[in-house]
């Protein structure tokens, strides 16, 4: 194994990290998925926010992004434009750049980003550094997946939909910026596996036990 590969895929971390010099390491990740919103602009925002979060979870700052997109031939050009605009605006908000990308034809739209960020090699955060006595903090409420599932079944209220959209398009930049000011030992991005799944990965990777106070979890 290359000694400069600080984080690989052996412990299910959010991104890989490669040491370039004594004070610089690259953080790389890729994430894309089918639409979870009917509005293409909103979908672009959600997908970009999700991809950028993997770099934030490693303690890094995203800098360079590549679009990854699949679209049907029948998709209107304006919808494609709005999709890309949604992604671009979130990348711009993060202080990063879109420098290219790749697109293919597919029956179902898909969109996301390949993201490269920077972090100091001594300040990399992983999901396997938790220690006994640490306090587990959530930066967003959980349950967004439940809301999006309800939306697909047309069972979600307007208030619930607005809340889900706000949370899914809020960058974790401010959480990352606050986190790096303190002695945080471990971090992960809670997404598809939910709180329990990602807590299990953190506990297993860190060789510790996690105790969740259910009443304190923001839903």
Regions found by a protein language model. Give the residues of each.
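Helix-biased detector of long, well-ordered alpha-helical tracts
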Residues: 1-219
